Amino acid sequence: MAWPCITRACCIARFWNQLDKADIAVPLVFTKYSEATEHPGAPPQPPPPQQQAQPALAPPSARAVAIETQPAQGELDAVARATGPAPGPTGEREPAAGPGRSGPGPGLGSGSTSGPADSVMRQDYRAWKVQRPEPSCRPRSEYQPSDAPFERETQYQKDFRAWPLPRRGDHPWIPKPVQISAASQASAPILGAPKRRPQSQERWPVQAAAEAREQEAAPGGAGGLAAGKASGADERDTRRKAGPAWIVRRAEGLGHEQTPLPAAQAQVQATGPEAGRGRAAADALNRQIREEVASAVSSSYRNEFRAWTDIKPVKPIKAKPQYKPPDDKMVHETSYSAQFKGEASKPTTADNKVIDRRRIRSLYSEPFKEPPKVEKPSVQSSKPKKTSASHKPTRKAKDKQAVSGQAAKKKSAEGPSTTKPDDKEQSKEMNNKLAEAKESLAQPVSDSSKTQGPVATEPDKDQGSVVPGLLKGQGPMVQEPLKKQGSVVPGPPKDLGPMIPLPVKDQDHTVPEPLKNESPVISAPVKDQGPSVPVPPKNQSPMVPAKVKDQGSVVPESLKDQGPRIPEPVKNQAPMVPAPVKDEGPMVSASVKDQGPMVSAPVKDQGPIVPAPVKGEGPIVPAPVKDEGPMVSAPIKDQDPMVPEHPKDESAMATAPIKNQGSMVSEPVKNQGLVVSGPVKDQDVVVPEHAKVHDSAVVAPVKNQGPVVPESVKNQDPILPVLVKDQGPTVLQPPKNQGRIVPEPLKNQVPIVPVPLKDQDPLVPVPAKDQGPAVPEPLKTQGPRDPQLPTVSPLPRVMIPTAPHTEYIESSP
């Protein structure tokens, strides 16, 4: 039976009296019922027949408890009666049952006189008896001394005997009376002063102790015990009484028993008392003792805990190295270190730690100083963009510088991520060319450039104004951007303002030239921003502000880059982003400025928005709106199908831009990546055609995306408005941002996008018209980028380190 804990030995071992007399039904502990009756406290129980009367003797409660739960054989009937007898086979059972029934508890014992045999219960219990476990180990009440003498010393004590510490005056070199060998000692009493055990014996090893123990048992426990307790003075007598000398004797000071003497010693002792008197004998004995001590027979603390000198130390096994470095020399350069090279990596320099450290130190102290490889222009590119108000011309130079710088940066970054940077570089270069071509077209746009140029270089200033303009056009968006771009707001709003209000148109008007410029501007930023966008959405979602800045900065190059980059950027953009991010970092200032007007205000709103949108749509938007037409139419076519999905997605996406845009972007990225590549290139370059086409495309996309725009516009419309104003492309990015960034960027861009979104929803209506389509497309265009955003996102990380200060600081407002 599986009884609970009560039956465990630990419980069974408790005092039986307490167990039995407890008023709880512990008797489960008993394995056989008879045990219940054999209380240690109760008088010896009579045989079962009388037993039933007997139980009264036991304390009633205990009796009742014991009996009720597991009655003894004698009491089974009583239990049966108590429980209410089942009609018994014999007539006796019934009469007995009566009394039992009346008093189930204490009355049990007094109950029936009937023999145990008559009860049905008895049969039941008999059946139990069959299964009864082995007889219980419960101690019997009376103590039966065992035949073997009681061992007073427990095994524990034997195992942990006190060490045989020598007595204070015990010096082995001082002659002591020799101990007599077993034979002689048995015959004659010891003569002379009681001799302490020789040291060899005092320190006798445990084996000896064990032997002694065995012997101790033989001669007689009492003698051994007495000897153990005997004091030194009595030792003689004890020994005499005890019998053979080797009976274990516990010398008082020595914790150890005396054990049979070694043969040599026995001989010495055999010589008898005479020998004991002689000094020679003592010397011999001591010599013997010393030998024995030396022979490790002795045990003492010194010996016991002696270092194991004779054991050879284990020869450590050298584990085979798990990692076998490749035979060819390892390149200890990470993509990170490659990116932040102080100088162009010279093979020898790489190994020179001092130079390397100096390079890194300078890198961190002057993070924007790019390696010679990268060309300082990139550094300057960011600053000139900020500082130079030379608008388009400087912008051109800046774009070139930024692009070259970015290209260089990308080259440096290419070491770490070759493919992405390459794409970025190529796309940037292409974008630069496109941007330059547009710039040449847009040279007149210089003015616009001023309008947008401010966007480019003075964007902060212009953008300040632009924002108001943007505020007008992008007002809603800009206003939030105002917050982010607060400073930017004052100047650019004017520029962008008109641009933005009309951005589709104004941007057209602004774009007309600026569009050209913007195409370049946007194209570069678009590029970067395209990449930025992807990143920005990611980066921008976090970095939105930064991105905005970055994007702003990105936009300049990105616009250029992005023109092409849109195509590549979609591809490159993801990769580009890192570089763009880097570029953007530096570019941020300029870009922010460059696109600042457009982007800055938008950057923040549109920061994300501008980048991509800036790309295709930035340039494309004004003219590109037309431009984007083709692009859009192609993308829209590509994306239109996508758009429908994306529109749905994007509408959803706008709402849940990330979702849709993620998906939308994917497709759009694909389509627009493809489409954009062509269109972007074309768009930047072909802006006119595409613009026209895009216009139609936009319109159609608007239709396709119109729905999307509405939702997207709703979500992204805000973006779109900004984008519309800033740039269709911008819209794209916001879609990105919105798709991606919107959730997060919305945070950063929330001020930018969300508020602008809200404001721009109104704006959206206006921009939505032209750019609604453009936006959708940009959404799509950027949508595609969005997909890449994921790809870019890692890159954004790279980016973050580079331009983080600018991005975060500037955009943090």
From Swiss-Prot:
Ranges for region Mn 3: 298-321
Q: What tissue expression does the UniProt record report for this protein?
A: Expressed in brain (at protein level). Expressed in spinal cord. Isoform 2 expression is up-regulated in the prefrontal cortex (Brodmann's area 46) of patients with schizophrenia (postmortem brain study).
One of the record's GO cellular component terms: transport vesicle membrane
Composition bias (Pro residues) maps to 41-50
Q: Where is this region: Disordered?
A: 36-283, 314-651, 756-813
What keywords does the record list, in alphabetical order?
Calmodulin-binding, Cell projection, Cytoplasm, Cytoplasmic vesicle, Cytoskeleton, Golgi apparatus, Lipoprotein, Membrane, Microtubule, Palmitate, Phosphoprotein, Transport
The subunit field of the Swiss-Prot or TrEMBL record says:
Interacts with calmodulin (via C-terminus); the interaction is dependent on Ca(2+). Interacts (via C-terminus) with TMEM106B (via N-terminus). Interacts with ZDHHC17 (via ANK repeats). Interacts with ZDHHC13 (via ANK repeats).
Tell me what this protein is called: Microtubule-associated protein 6
Species of provenance: Homo sapiens
